[in-house]
Amino acid sequence: MKRDILDAKFFDTRIREENIGGKERVLGYFLGPVSVVFLNSILNNYLNVYYTDVVQLGHVWNGWFLTVFPIVVKVLDALTFLLMGIIVDRFYSRQGVARPWILFSAPLLALSFILLFFFPSGNRGLMLIWIFVSYNLFYSIAYTAYNTCHTLLVPLSTRNREQRGKLSVLTNTQGMFSGMLVAVMFPTFVIPAIGISRRNWIVLMAALAAVMLPCVLLEYFYTRERVTEESRKRGEQHIDNVENAGLDHCAEEGKINVGQNAASHKRSMKEQLRLCLQSRSWTVLMIYLVLSQLTGLLASFGTFYYCNWVLGSYNDGYTQALYYAVGNAPLGLGLFLCRPVCKKFGRQNAMAGGFLLAAAGTAVCVWNPQNIKVVLAGQVLKSIGLIPSTYMVSAMLGDALDDVEEKTGVRCDGFSSSVYNIVFTLTTGVAMCILNLGLTQLGYVAPEMDDIPLQNEAVRGFFTFCTVGLPTILYPLIAVVLWMETKRVKTGKKAKQK
């Protein structure tokens, strides 16, 4: 993408206000990205179902294709996230460092999403190659470019913590809203209607991709990078930072873009990692993300199978919808409860206590995993506990980036966004690998058009463990990690006061 093209006024943000207003929140931070979140929610919940039940790839290479494929492509995806982080750290234009890549990714997202479902079926070897290429086109290129920069929009939108906290709640509402929509509509109406017909799946996904494209453009045109603009105006201060870091010649020659963090512009990934690790907040955030994402993703991937083979019957049209609609209903109240609760108890205290409550809820589900009333009660309890963590991740990232800058004098935004997304990417691959390993090795039988099989006890127990068992084990561990950081912060504040 040429920088002179981006200098045209047509590509300027439509947001002129210095403070974040309603138009920016609604169009830029909700309606814009919600389409991508919605489609990604579909992929997280149903792409593996498409592979196992529609295309029936479960027995390819004796089941090892679906076991190895997720982790291989996610490793490649992680590498491209690192590359994208380097690009963002070294890129600057009139439109900012992140927004231009959202514009670039919009058409690629739509095209590659369709190709995930539309592939030749006559030649198995060609089909597997197509799946590999299309998956990497979507995740390693289009989604990587989009999500690296989408992740940065809230931290770069403003330095005002209150406004950033409100944006964090709003942006994380997308995940809840999209997840609920997919969880209720798909098992109730969509999946029973399209069945296991490949043609029906392809037509539906193409229509959804067409709707997504203009929404991504809304996100580009109705957001603004105020922190980037501020950095540009403080160019002289950045040059002083360069000189203090021993890079006087670069400052004198004016080789560093004014809009970039001059001290981080030429730093290697290893050096930026060293700087980030000096921030305890940054380190705790990454540990938290690994544990919470692995737990949440494995539960999410296993939910379809758990609801169809343990809690209810295959595509009965209501079990999975009830599981999500009733079980996750408290998350809707979180839009109004999250900020008051976090303000009263402290963000990390609220999150830590919430995870313990969530663990109690999943323990109720484990106690009687086939009783829908018991499971729904447990899910309601779990959802109440997860309210703080559901809405506060973006704010945690923004605070961690500010803490890195405070500790080191350097902003490592692009690098941190890459690591943030690498955690999401690799935990997705690991979770999918674990799920598919269980499917293929424990004897999962895919349904046919007119034949709904019975699954053995080992398979059913595995689905229960993925969906409600593992969270019962890991949620308390996550709470301990958050509480240790809270205790450290309080100790640090007392030491400063002395």
Residue map of PLM features:
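Membrane-embedded alpha-helical bundles of multi-pass transporters/translocases
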Residues: 2-246, 254-498
